[in-house]
Design a protein with these regions (language model features):
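Phosphate/NTP-binding elements of NTP-utilizing enzymes
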Residues: 10, 22, 29, 50, ...
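A short acidic, often aromatic-flanked loop/helix-cap motif at beta-alpha or helix-coil junctions
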Residues: 6-10, 71-72, 95, 100
Length: 110
């Protein structure tokens, strides 16, 4: 379910519900810089960080996907609440959109 609440900021972009678990994901999209040492930001707002950290502390499954033209990187739990990664490291973690979709499906469904 795509979420948008103009009265309560910070809620994750999408909520997935399955027979195994629920999963809240915040999506970010970046154009990757050309230089390997340039940092790919994880631009979460303070409210987004607070919301994800709070739900994670409650035992809920949360994560951040930083997408780009080539695919995306999955940051489970609150690991996506950091400052970012150098392009070279980001590319090393990059998976395809199909792999991301399968990861999400396996996280919520038996």
């Amino acid at each position: 379910m795509k979420n948008h609440n103009q009265y309560n900021g910070g809620i994750a972009d999408v909520w997935y519900s399955g027979d195994k678990a629920d999963l809240w994901i915040e999506y970010k999209f970046e154009v990757l810089p050309k230089r390997d040492d340039t940092i790919v930001p994880i631009d979460l707002s303070p409210l987004q960080r607070e919301w994800l950290t709070g739900r994670h502390a409650e035992g809920r499954s949360v994560g951040v996907v930083v997408g780009c033209r080539e695919g995306g990187v999955w940051f489970p739990g609150t690991t996506g609440c950091g400052a970012g990664l150098p392009v070279k490291s980001f590319r090393g973690l990059l998976i395809t959109r199909i792999e991301l979709a399968d990861l999400i499906r396996r996280s919520v469904s038996s």
